[in-house]
């Protein structure tokens, strides 16, 4: 599936009664909530002796993707453009791949 196709299909389940502002707020809160659920799965694996529940984690990652698509939609952006811009930023930051020295020397304004 193409990224923008996912965004379009995912947004068919968006509440149409929400304003653009409410969609953005909901998306950011949803990203935080679902990220917390993913963190909890990893925490239980890392610190509490549980097996890593990959199936559950994959479902939470899917929910995170949905809220990311919602945020992009609220901003009238498409995910493909966001992801391409992110890769371009990372290529400039780490042209030869990740480098600890370059990471440590990163300037504060390099977001």
Indicate where each model-derived feature is located.
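Flexible "arm" and connector segments at domain edges
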Residues: 1-61, 65-111
